Amino acid sequence: MGLLSVNPGGHAMRPAVLLPLVVQDLYYEIGGKCLLEDISFRTDAGPRTVVLGPNGAGKSLLLRLCHGLLQPSAGTIAWAWATPEVARRCQAMVFQRPVLLRRSTAANITYVLRLQGIPRRQRRAMITEALEQAGLLPLAAQPARVLSGGEQQRLALARAWALKPQVLFLDEPTASLDPAATQAVEALLDHIHCTGTKIIMTTHDLGQARRLADEVLFLHHGRLVEHAPATAFFDNPQSKEAIAFLEGKLLW
């Protein structure tokens, strides 16, 4: 998980401006098989970007490449004025199944703050803010492993957001959650968005995409088929693949 850099006084800071993110002629191959092909797009600060597509379209793979967990076979991923090293420190990623420490709820956030060199005297306020926004402050002393699935995902989000990353990648963050837990996660994402963090996420849930997306990247068979404002995509899709997907038809 990439986090913000910290100045000598121990304060989190937003160094170079990351956005826009520009992806150009991106390819990714494994064992001679091309999984992502000729993908190009630009996304700016502000709009929430939702990556849609059927299973196997390459959605999660695209997020991992943009986050720097994987290296492209060809093409470029460029972050405005930030070097790759700075970019990694100014972004975070949360996965479908949260990976939490076998410690208390609060200690999971303490850990990332300590890694970033935040002085102990400043951590408490940052931990309290993150847990409060996630609705987890009353559970601060509880072991993370006894939290419900929805609470664990909110903890993963709170931990990722504690240092105010400029960009937050989310890979199917509510795929295994019930409607109530999904609603709580979406409310937290709304708050994170309102603080200025850019959200780029994948989802299979068309209802969720309609609720959250400001712009849509639609992938099919490893290719970017459509990139459009959410309203335009849902009201007037341009490709036969997107039309079929929105109609609930199976794509392969």
What is the predicted role of each segment?
Residues 67:
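Helix-to-loop junction immediately C-terminal to a conserved catalytic motif
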Residues 209-211:
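A short, surface-exposed alpha-helical micro-motif characterized by mixed small hydrophobic
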Residues 121-139:
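Conserved ABC ATPase "signature" region
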Residues 168-171:
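Catalytic Walker B motif of ABC-type/P-loop ATPase nucleotide-binding domains
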Residues 143-147, 151:
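Conserved ABC ATPase signature
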Residues 179-181:
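Helix N-cap at the start of a conserved alpha-helix in ABC-type nucleotide-binding domains
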Residues 203-204:
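H-loop/switch region of ABC-family ATPase nucleotide-binding domains
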